[in-house]
């Protein structure tokens, strides 16, 4: 009998407390970058019943109305009703932002490679904002080259948000979570969806029967291809039986607590650094995007069915201390060739990544819910496949 395996990933909606915090942090980042592309930003947010705290370090000459940005973001998510215990117009906003540490700024503004060397490449000027390791991943399971469990999980909660915002399901509230378990065959290919879990916040008058039927008919069957569903697929819809109290009234939220949702759903390794609220000099964010860019182009070039890229940096140093590529036995060329090609084709210094992916723009708010990777609804530079030919040529 052939061996089959299960793998599970989850996602959360834009109304989840941690995702509210991520979106506020990235909305603040975008508002600052729109006025000052050279700004250094590390904005953290905490949300709970009736209150938002914004704190962190910012170096900029621009003025941004933090209070207004916070309220507008909360309203866009859908928290406009005081019955939810968290509303855009009544929430208390408490900003506490200070200037970036001069000790950190010293290494970021002038990398180790250029100190005392006036003739150095200008892209060596910016040092990494911190030490750390970052991963990027791609696999040929879906059109967007993402693992199927996280791809489906994102689509389910996005569909819930669409139905809520359009009014098609009028009783939905903003908070929601999804989880998808996929069965893989002996060749590690997805063959069916084993289990779907959806918990969605709702008005008190909505019945469990109504929610169950609507979610199956208008969400699950609209999102998951019928070829993956069978009579053994299990559905758990609001399994606690009631989800009226949600959002920050039900749980506090904090920036950076959904890093697996933001990336590959646990299918690939993660370096531990969060993305939201950080400008691109923070390699936690920019190098993770660069690693995804490399991995996706490798898979799209048919050089591997699956690719994971690790980058690592030292604070204040421009060049990465290591580049590692793992194709899990699916590569058509040696991994050492891919690593050499990646270093040749992709500029992996922080300033090089910023230039390559044009990361000084206010593009981050749109990434802060429903995943930073594999997005097909928005144009993200690290999702482009413009290095395929160069990679093929480099490994000949």
From Swiss-Prot:
Keywords: ATP-binding, Cytoplasm, Magnesium, Metal-binding, Nucleotide-binding, One-carbon metabolism, Potassium, Transferase. It is found in: Cytoplasm. It holds the Pfam family S-AdoMet_synt_M. Mg(2+) binds at residue 18. Its EC number is 2.5.1.6. It is an enzyme of class 2 (transferase). K(+) binds at residue 44. Pathway: Amino-acid biosynthesis; S-adenosyl-L-methionine biosynthesis; S-adenosyl-L-methionine from L-methionine: step 1/1. The lineage of its organism: Bacteria, Bacillati, Bacillota, Bacilli, Lactobacillales. It catalyses: L-methionine + ATP + H2O = S-adenosyl-L-methionine + phosphate + diphosphate. It comes from the Bacteria. L-methionine binds at residues 57, 100, 251, 282. It comes from Streptococcus pneumoniae serotype 4 (strain ATCC BAA-334 / TIGR4). Catalyzes the formation of S-adenosylmethionine (AdoMet) from methionine and ATP. The overall synthetic reaction is composed of two sequential steps, AdoMet formation and the subsequent tripolyphosphate hydrolysis which occurs prior to release of AdoMet from the enzyme. GO terms for cellular component: cytoplasm. Homotetramer; dimer of dimers. Binds 2 divalent ions per subunit. Its main location: cytoplasm. The gene is metK. This is S-adenosylmethionine synthase. ATP binds at residues 16, 175-177, 242-243, 251, 257-258, 274, 278. Its cofactor is Mg(2+); K(+).
